């Protein structure tokens, strides 16, 4: 669509429809036979959120995607299609080594080729975006996501991250949108515990944990994902200084900033920030 067509569409959308476009749900919410019980069932979003949701996580298989997309398009007032995304981390149908293993190759061209193959297979299934690459500098083996990173070196993370973004996005007909994650400092959480605070100096943060992003952003990834953690007791997902001041204004990122799985809620109830933050 042209810019003027998008502007016209936005002007015709209700507030609920615009909010819905910013919500991502799992495929279970669109499964006609699924019965959501327990905690998930108790936390079902309002019906209009499901009706106007903008994207879907983790549905694999072109037949499933086609079925959900067809039913969704029929009932959406503006027929805006869903965006299907998944964690295509180290391959889709053809599996490559985990990112930590790929880093050991010191071969960015090969890493880029593996990402290109994964993108081609994923796009043929109807997926349009992946939550990869993860370029968190990772030095604490207690942290449960070590294997998803390229290891302890900022430079290696940056080079391999850029290569992977190039591989995912380089082909217009078979490429998928890449997502750099997790901005920033996620690999330095205290004691390797998820959602924990990060307590490092500003210099270390910028020179070691932001550096890979600065390098990989040169490949122009479509998305950047925020980190679960807080730094200086400020949760990243609600940190204007980092997300706007550093990422957008200083580093020049013009793509989409996306939050991690359910990370908006913890801004208040995990990191104990005021609801007005």
Which ranges hold each PLM region?
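Glycoside hydrolase catalytic-domain context in secreted enzymes
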Residues: 1-274
């Amino acid at each position: 669509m042209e810019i003027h067509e998008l502007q016209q569409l936005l002007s015709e959308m209700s507030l609920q429809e615009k909010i819905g476009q910013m919500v991502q749900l799992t495929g279970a919410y669109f499964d006609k036979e699924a019965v959501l019980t327990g905690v998930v069932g108790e936390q079902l979003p309002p019906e209009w959120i499901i009706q106007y949701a903008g994207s879907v996580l983790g549905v694999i298989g072109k037949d499933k995607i086609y079925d959900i997309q067809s039913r969704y398009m029929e009932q959406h007032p503006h027929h805006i299609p869903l965006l299907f995304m998944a964690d295509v981390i180290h391959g889709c149908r053809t599996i490559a080594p985990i990112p930590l293993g790929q880093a050991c190759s010191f071969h960015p061209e090969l890493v880029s080729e593996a990402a290109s193959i994964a993108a081609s297979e994923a796009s043929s299934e109807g997926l349009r975006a992946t939550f990869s690459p993860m370029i968190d500098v990772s030095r604490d083996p207690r942290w449960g996501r070590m294997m998803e990173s390229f290891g302890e070196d900022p430079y290696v993370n940056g080079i391999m991250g850029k290569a992977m973004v190039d591989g995912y996005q380089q082909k217009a007909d078979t490429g998928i949108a890449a997502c750099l994650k997790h901005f920033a400092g996620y690999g330095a959480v205290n004691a390797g515990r998820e959602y924990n605070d990060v307590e490092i100096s500003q210099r270390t943060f910028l020179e070691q944990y932001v550096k890979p992003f600065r390098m990989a952003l040169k490949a122009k990834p479509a998305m950047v994902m925020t980190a679960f953690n807080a730094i200086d007791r400020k949760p990243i997902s609600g940190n204007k200084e980092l997300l706007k001041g550093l990422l957008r204004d200083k580093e020049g990122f013009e793509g989409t900033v996306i939050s991690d799985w359910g990370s908006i809620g913890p801004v208040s109830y995990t990191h104990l920030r005021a609801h007005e933050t």
